[in-house]
Amino acid sequence: MEPLRPQITYGPIETVDNEELTEADMLSFISAAVNSTGLIGYNIKSFDDLMDNGIPQIVKQMFNVDITYKDQRDHTEIDKLRESVQIQFNFTDVNIERPQHRNYSQGNKINLLPNKARLCGLSYSGPVNLAAEVILTAHYSNGRQEVKRASIPPFQVSTFPIMRGSNRCHTHHLSKTAKKEIGEDPNEPGGYFIARGGEWVVDLLENIRFNTLHIHYHTMQQGNNEIIRGEFISQPGGAFENSSQIIIRYMTTGAITIEINSTKFSKLRIPWYLIFRMFGMTGDDSIIEQVVFDLESNSLVNTFMIEILEKSIHVLDPIFQPVQHELNREKIIQFLSEKVSKFVSNPSAYKSDENAVQYLNERQLTILDKILLPHMGQTADTRVRKLRFLGLLIHKILLVIMNVFPPTDRDSYRTKRVHGSGVSLAKAFKAIFNTSVIAPIINGFKELLKQTAFEELTQRNIIEAFSAALSKNTASDLNRSMEQSIISGNKTIMVRQRPIVNRVSTQSLERKNLLNTISALRTVNTHNTTNASKQTERADMMRRVHASYPGYICVAQSADTGEKVGMSKQLAITANVCTAGEVLSLKQRLLSDPAIQQLADVSNKDIVRKGLARVFINGEWIGCCTNAFELAQRYRMLRREGKIVHPHTTIYWDSMVDEVEFWLDVGRLTRPLLIVDNNIEKYNQACYKAAEARKKGDKDWEKHKIPFVQNTRFTSQMAKDILAGTLTLEDLVAQGICEFITPEEAENCLVAFSIIELRKHKHDVTRRFTHVDVPQAILGLAALVSPYANCTQPARVTYETNQGRQTGGWYCFSWPYRVDMNRFFQFYNEMPLVKTIAHNYVIPNGLNTIVAYMIYGGYNQEDSVIVSQSFIDRGGFAGTFYREEKVELESDIESFGKPDPLITKNLKPGANYEKLVDGFVPVGTVVKKGDIIIGKVAKIRGEKDELNKYIDRSVMYGFDEPAVVDAVMRPHGPNDEIFGLMRLRYERNLNIGDKMSSRSGNKGIAALALPTSDMPFTEDGLQPDLIVNPHSHPSRMTNGQMIETTVGLANALQGVVTDGTAFLPINVQLLSERLAQEGLRFNGCQKMFNGQTGEYFDAAIFIGPTYHQRLQKFVLDDRYAVASYGPTDALTGQPLDGKRSHGGLRLGEMEHWVLTAQGAMQTIIEKSHDDSDGCISYVCRNCGEPAIYNASHPIYKCMNCDVQADIGMVDSRRSSIVFQHEMRAANVNITSVLSPRVFQPA
C-alpha cells in the first residue's frame, strides 16, 4: 500500500505576478482573518463546544456511578441475609435549553431575553434536563441476587449559565433588525455572561500543554533533596476528559521516584523500577532497556545513563525496603495496595484471605490502568505501551541531567495552551455537579434502602427517590454555584458546605467603549499567582515578552503598573484559539500509512540502530518512521490540499529529538500565514545539469542554470476581492494560498517579516522562506489604534492600549434600553483624519482637535493642557453620564409611594418629598441634593397608634451635582419581588482637571479654559482647540503623534482620510510636497499671533489636527472627596474610603512629604487628627487606667483610685480606644503612663 501523497499541482511560481502588491494591500489579509473568525468568535465557539459535546460527555461518561455498600437494615430475616447493595446509575440523555424564567402573573415559563435579565437582576441561564437509568442489586449470603431497575424520564435538574451570542442564546442567528426589536445592540458580538443582572467575562487562561513532559530544575530548599523533576499530565481525548498527573523526580541520593497524583491514590513517591515490575517486567536489564533503548551501545551518553539507572535501583528507600529486591509482582502489588490504596479502609486486614488479596490486587491494577498515562490506553493490553512510554520520559529527563538537552522553556507558547470559557466552565462543572447532584442521589438511595425493604421496592419508589434527591435545594445549589464561579472569579467557593477551588478566571465587563469590551473578551491571563507575586528572577521572566509571542500575543498591550504587568495579555489581531479536532480519524490514517511502523512492531534497539523517528498524536506514541522531515512535509501538503487532516492540525517536527508531533487538542493558538512557494526542485535540477555540462567541457554550461525564485501566490487582485467581500479566508485556505500555523509549527518555519523582505530575498537560495507575514499582525486591536505605532516608544503604545480602553464614546447602541451604573456617553465622535485598521472594527471614541505645540502663559507645563473655551462651548468632549438607583421591596409590609407625614414617622429632616408621584420622581424632573427620588414606606407590625402606622425608608439624592431623571422602571426580580429602578442623567462638559489623551499615549489634563479672544491664531485665522507643551515629546519619544499631526494637516486641507496603521511606509518627501501644495512650510509649522497682545511669536509654531480622546476620569466625581467633612465609620470615627460610600481620598506618604516640605505641619495635624478620629481621653495618673469624665455634670472619677484619683487629659484617637477595649476583652490589660504634674511658681 502506497502512502497517500499530495495530488494538486500548483502553477509555476515564476509565473506569479504580484509586483503591484503593496504593504497597504497586505492589510486586507488581516481583514480576511478577522472577518472569518470574528474578534471573539473563538470564545463563542468554545462555549458551543461545551454545550454540544462537553456537558453531555462529562455527564454521560464521567459520572457512571457504581458503588457497593454494606446493608444496614436488619428488620426481617431477609434483611439479615442481605449482605450488600450495589447502586448503579448513569445518565442517558442531557439537554440544555435556551434561557427561560417563570412568569408569576400567568403561572408559566416564558423565554428570558438578555436585556430582561439585565434589568430584572436575573441570571441568563438555560434549563438542564437529565434522563437516567438506575439499577439496584441486592447480594445475599446464600449467593442469590435481586435486581430492581427503573428509567428516569427527562426532567429539569437545574440551570446553566448561557453565553450571550452562543447557539443557546435567543439572539443566535438573529438579524440586526430583530436584535433592535428586543433591545439588543445589533453590532454587539456577545461572548459574555449575565449573572444576577451583571455582565461578566470568562478570561482566557494559560495552561501547560497536556501529554507533554515538562522538565524543570528544582530550587534546593531546606529538607528537600530534589535536583530535577519532570511533570507529565496525561489526558485522553484532548478536551473535556479527566486528566492524571505523574511527577518523576531525580534526587541527590541518585534515586528516581514516580509520584501519581490521583483522588484514588495516596501521594507517595514510588521507586521507578517498581512500576515496571508491577506490570510484569521483572528483570533489571529489561527495565533499563526501556529507558536507554540499546544496552549494547557504547556511546558515552548511553554508558552514563546506565550508571545512573543502576545506581537508582540500589538506592535504599526506607518505605519500600521490603520490596526493593522483590521480583514477585503479586507481592509488590499487594505491598503497594496497602500503602497507597484509598478504596479500602484497612488493606492489611485482607492478608489472611487469599481471594480478598487477589481481588485487592486486581482492583489495584485496574485503577492503575486508568490513572497511569491514560492517554496511552486504559486497559490491561496497553501496559507494555505505557512502560515503553514511561521509559521514554525517564530517558528525556536523564538527557537533561547530562546537559544534552536544556530544560523546558516555561514561557514558550510551544508548550502552552490557552483555555477558553468552555474548558474553564467544564472544570468548575465537574466538581460542582459531583457535589450538588451525584452525592445527593447516592444519599437518597441509601436513605430509601434504609427505610424500605428491598423486595418491596417498586419502579415508582426509585423514580421518586431519584427526583426527591434532586429537589429544589439541589437545583439551586448547582445553579448558585455555577453563578458564583463566574462572579467570584478564581476563588474558593462553597458547595453544600464544602470548599471547592474555582478554576474560572473572570472580570466584570465595564462598558466604557466598544474597544474596552472587545479587549476584555480577548484577555489572556497567566494563572501563576504564587511565583508572580514574588520578587524573584522567575517572576521577572514570566513578565517578559517571549520570542514565541509575535503573531499570537500582542507584544505591546499589558498592564502598565502593578502585579498584572506581563501577566494579563491580549491576543494578537489575527490570533485564534482552536477547539479540539477529530483525533480518531487522523490516528487511523497515520496507523495505516506504510511509512509509519506501529509501536508494537518496533523494538527499542531498532529505534537506535536504524535511526527511527518517533511519531506522536496528541502526545500518544503510536509508532516510528524512517524520515521524519519527509513525513511532516507530506502531511503538511495534504493539509494544504484539504485531505486527511483538519486545516488547524498542528504538524511539528522536533529535529532535536527527531520526533514528529500531530496535535488536535483544545486551546492551541493559531494564526493564518501566507505560504511562500519556490522552484527549488527545478533549480536543483538545473544546477545539476549545468554541473554535468561543465564537467563535459561545455562552454555554454551556464545556459542550463535558472534563477531561484520564491514568492507568495497572494496578489493585489485578491486583496481587492477581500475588500469587496467576494473572497474570504476560507477561500484562500482552500486554494492553498495560506495556512494556519501554531507556535510549535512556527519553529519549523522561516517567516519573512513583510512582503518587502520577501522581495529583497526573492532570488536568495540561502534564505528560503516558508511563509510571509503581515507586520501589523504582531499587535493586538488596542495597539493598532495608535497611528504610526512603530515610530513611537513602545512604552507609550502600552500606555495607549490602557488609555484607549478608558476613553469616552458610545459604549453600545442599545443604551436607551439599558440601565447601567457609571456609564459615560459622549455626544460627538469623529472618524480620525489619520485612521488605522483598528477603526474598521471599533467605532471612534474621540475628536479631531486642532493642537498647537507651544508654551503659552504657563498653564500648560508638564502634562497640563490649555483648552479653548469656544471648543468647550461647541460641545467638545461633551457627553452624558448615567447612574442608577435600585431599591427593592424587602418584604410584604413595604410599598412604594409618597409618605404621608400624618401617619409616617422617621421622615428625613430637611428632605423634599414634593417631587414624588406614586413613589417615584417623574421622568424629566431635575433633582438636587436633599430631594427624595424614590419614596418607600414600611408598615409597622403590631402598631396600634394610628398616627405611626408607617416608617419612612425612602431614598434621598445625596450628590451636589444636579441630575435629570431619565428613566423609571418597576421590574420584577427572580422571586417576583418588585424593585424600583431609576436612571439618572448628568451633563458632563469638559471641566478643569479632566483628562484627555492622544492615540500615542500622551496624556494631558485640562488646566485652563481660555476665552477665544485670548487664544493664539494663525495668519489664516485658525485657532487651536488645545495648546500642548512641546517638551513632553522628546523625552517620551511620541514621534507617531508628530507624524499624525503633520499628515492630518495635509489631509484636512485636501479633504481626504489616509491610513496611518503601524509599519506602513511613510514618504517624507511626498508629505512635504503635499504641504507645499497648500501653501505651508515643508514641516507644517506656521507663523502665529499672540491672542492677548496681537504680536507675532518669534518662532514658527507647529499646529495641526490631532485625534484626542477624553478619558473617563471626571473631576466632578472626586470633588466630594476633597473636603473637611464627610461620612465616617460608626465604630472608629475615621473617614470612609471609596466612591460607593462617598468617602475621601487617602492622604498618603508622598502627600505628607509635600506638606512637610512646605512647612504645613498644622495642616497634617488637622487632616490626620481633627478631621479624622481625634478625640480627648481621660486617664488616671496613679493607676494608668481609663477614667470617667462627664462634662455636663463635672464628674471626674477613677474606678480604682476613687477619691485619690489624679485624672489627666490626653489627645488620643477613637481607633486607639477601640483597640484597647478589644485587648481588655481578650484579658490583656493596657495601662498608660502620664508625665507627672509640673507646677509653675506664681
UniProtKB/Swiss-Prot annotation:
Recorded hits in SUPFAM superfamilies, A to Z, give: beta and beta-prime subunits of DNA dependent RNA-polymerase
Q: Which GO terms describe its biological process?
A: DNA-templated transcription; viral transcription
* Positions annotated as zinc finger (C4-type): 1180-1201
Question: Which reaction is the catalytic activity of this chain?
Answer: RNA(n) + a ribonucleoside 5'-triphosphate = RNA(n+1) + diphosphate
Which segments does the entry list as coiled coil? none
Family per record: Belongs to the RNA polymerase beta chain family.
Q: What is this protein called?
A: DNA-directed RNA polymerase RPB2 homolog
Source organism of the structure: African swine fever virus (isolate Tick/South Africa/Pretoriuskop Pr4/1996) (ASFV)
